[in-house]
Amino acid sequence: MKRTKSIRHASFRKNWSARHLTPVALAVATVFMLAGCEKSDETVSLYQNADDCSAANPGKSAECTTAYNNALKEAERTAPKYATREDCVAEFGEGQCQQAPAQAGMAPENQAQAQQSSGSFWMPLMAGYMMGRLMGGGAGFAQQPLFSSKNPASPAYGKYTDATGKNYGAAQPGRTMTVPKTAMAPKPATTTTVTRGGFGESVAKQSTMQRSATGTSSRSMGG
């Protein structure tokens, strides 16, 4: 009988511990999950140029100029490239395209292209840029160029998009938003030309994926 009592007491202690530690474990797990969410998102500001940034951040003029210039260089490297001005204008609108420097990430696909001089490709103008803290907690700032179309027929019309076609809402500088940290990561260099309308298709696909992800997240949170 003594042995039976000791077994029951041990079982009781085990069950009591499980019942009372479970909420604590859940609370700890929740804290870690929230911490993970905080680390995966970042608040960024959207500016059209260095002057906009400087006006919004007194005393940070040098940082704003550096971020803007870095964004321009990144735009040259990652922006969609077109073989002709007409293809670029059809996507982004009149007055929204410029010749791309020959060294801006493009590799000649054939001998004819290799013989062409600087400016043989066309790319959209940088419409603005995102600016946020460096990943890893550095003291500097990270930046990401943004593009926008003025052609009403384009899926990128009136929107800020990055080089991959991801949509960041209306092309209105001076606002802040929360984005995944991956949004500020460097994008791959553009090494081939885009066909007419190709970038718009990328924007449309990305927008569909974003809406789908948002809907799935809302349903999950709603149970």
Curated annotation (Swiss-Prot):
InterPro entries: Biofilm_formation_YgiB
Biased composition annotated in UniProt, kind: Low complexity: 178-195
Name of the protein: UPF0441 protein YgiB
Similarity comment: family membership: Belongs to the UPF0441 family.
A family per Pfam: DUF1190
Transmembrane region(s): none
Region Disordered, annotated ranges: 178-223
Coiled-coil parts of chain: none
UniProt feature, compositional bias: Polar residues: 204-223
Gene Ontology biological-process entries: single-species biofilm formation
Highest taxon in the source lineage: Bacteria
Recorded GO CC terms: cell outer membrane
Species annotation: Escherichia coli (strain K12)
